[in-house]
């Protein structure tokens, strides 16, 4: 967790240098910003000290939160989430085959919670072990791990697999988009872009909510994604995910709430807003 924090602050320092803060502005920022973060009731501090000449928001809810903190509404623009523009282009016209195979192939996306200091390593590993041990009670599942390509140690999870004598594949650097073509259902407990991508691509997904510090965000709609709240029910939840009939209007409303527009034009909107302000 400390390494992650230091890396984030180094990035912040480089950013502050790039935008030409003078020494007094630099001191003021670094005295106030950590304090604001520490006492914020949000996971990201919404404070006037963060206001810029232009603030780009992914969703309307972000804009509303900032406006409540006194941000200038004229300087706050909603443009969507540019990181998904490339996904939109890659998946346009692609249909994913969600038909059941003889053995249900599960891609279990793990790791990241203790690395970011949100859980202890013991808590995260216990959840993983309990889940895998429950799944392997039945022979109808083929399970593989997918870990974060950067922030998670491959050696750590190889060791976990070896210690528990599991026969599992483990992926790290591989493209998630390519992997999910080979799997029937995605299983995870991590609050990450994986969840959003599954919703966008209409890929069956089950979110684990069996820990009292669950990572699942309240805005996830169970009419769109399946949630497992008890490992004894995980088989039913996996089956439900594969057979879920999703209302397109409900799905589109959830996408709008989570990431804004999914149209491949978020980067263009961001660039236009930046150009307008520097003219």
Give, region by region, the residue ranges found by the protein language model:
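Conserved N-terminal ligand/cofactor-binding loop architecture of enzyme catalytic domains
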Residues: 1-35
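A nucleotide-sugar donor-handling region in carbohydrate enzymes
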Residues: 25-28, 32-120, 246-252
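Structural motif
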Residues: 54, 105, 142, 184-185
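Short, aromatic/basic amphipathic alpha-helical patches
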Residues: 68-70, 155-165, 217-221
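Conserved catalytic-core segment of nucleotide-activated headgroup transferases in glycan assembly
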Residues: 83-160, 169
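Donor nucleotide-activated moiety binding/catalytic core segment of transferases
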Residues: 149-195, 200, 211
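Catalytic binding pocket for nucleotide-activated donors in carbohydrate/polymer assembly enzymes
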Residues: 161-162, 190-262
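C-terminal alpha-helical cap of glycosyltransferases
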Residues: 262-279
């Amino acid at each position: 967790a400390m390494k992650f924090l230091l890396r984030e602050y180094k990035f912040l320092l480089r950013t502050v240098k790039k935008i030409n803060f003078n020494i007094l502005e630099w001191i003021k920022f670094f005295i106030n910003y950590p304090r604001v973060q520490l006492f914020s009731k949000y996971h990201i501090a919404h404070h006037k000290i963060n206001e810029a000449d232009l603030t780009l928001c992914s969703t309307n809810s972000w804009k509303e939160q900032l406006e409540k903190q006194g941000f200038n509404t004229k300087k706050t623009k909603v443009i969507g989430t540019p990181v998904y523009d490339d996904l939109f282009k890659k998946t346009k016209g692609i249909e994913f085959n969600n038909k059941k195979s003889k053995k249900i192939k599960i891609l279990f996306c793990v790791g990241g919670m203790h690395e970011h200091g949100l859980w202890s390593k013991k808590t995260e590993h216990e959840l993983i072990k309990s889940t895998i041990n429950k799944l392997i009670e039945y022979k109808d599942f083929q399970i593989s791990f997918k870990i974060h390509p950067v922030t998670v140690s491959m050696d750590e999870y190889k060791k976990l697999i070896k210690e528990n004598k599991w026969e599992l594949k483990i992926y790290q650097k591989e493209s998630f988009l390519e992997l999910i073509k080979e799997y029937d259902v995605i299983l995870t407990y991590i609050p990450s872009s994986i969840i959003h991508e599954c919703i966008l691509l209409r890929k069956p997904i089950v979110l684990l909510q069996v820990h009292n510090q669950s990572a699942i965000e309240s805005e996830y709609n169970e009419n769109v994604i399946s949630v497992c709240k008890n490992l004894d029910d995980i088989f039913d939840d996996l089956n439900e995910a594969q057979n879920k009939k999703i209302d397109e209007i409900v799905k589109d409303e959830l996408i709008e709430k989570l990431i804004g527009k999914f149209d491949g034009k978020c980067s263009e909107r961001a660039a236009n807003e930046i150009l307008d302000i520097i003219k």
